[in-house]
Every structure is written in structure tokens, then in C-alpha cells.
Amino acid sequence: MKQIFIGIIRFYQKCISPLTPPSCRFYPTCSNYGLEAIKTHGALKGGWLTIKRILKCHPLHPGGIDPVPPKKEK
């Protein structure tokens, strides 16, 4: 499942993103955030963090630096 999500994001980065002007308000970009979140937290939690991030990426949000939260140790 994790590899499927990573593949979808990579496809977006290589095939769709170059066709549109840069518009992400955050650093790292939403797609890079998604890759890092899924690699760090797995498909379920990383996917959820990515969805939350994409929903924040709009003209009314100031944007800025928003790193992936570190994985909590148990």
C-alpha cells in the first residue's frame, strides 16, 4: 500500500506537476511532504497527514515552513 501511494505521488511529480506553474504555499512542497510523511509514518497515517496538508494549501492560508512531524517512539 505504501509503495502504491509513493508511486502515485511520483507520477504526479514527473507527469502532471511540470505542466502547471508552481503554486504550493509551503516548504517542503505538498508532494514532497506527502512522500516524506508516507515514508516516515506509513500509508495510513502518512496519507492522512498528506490529505490534511493539501487541504491547507489554498490562497487564504499564509503557508510557510511545515515539516512532517517526527514519528513518536513508544
From Swiss-Prot:
It is found in: Cell membrane. Its main location: membrane. It comes from Bacillus pumilus (strain SAFR-032). The keyword Membrane applies. Coiled coil: none annotated. The lineage of its organism: Bacteria, Bacillati, Bacillota, Bacilli, Bacillales. It is a peripheral membrane protein. This is Putative membrane protein insertion efficiency factor. HAMAP family: UPF0161_YidD (MF_00386). Could be involved in insertion of integral membrane proteins into the membrane. It holds the Pfam family YidD. Belongs to the UPF0161 family.
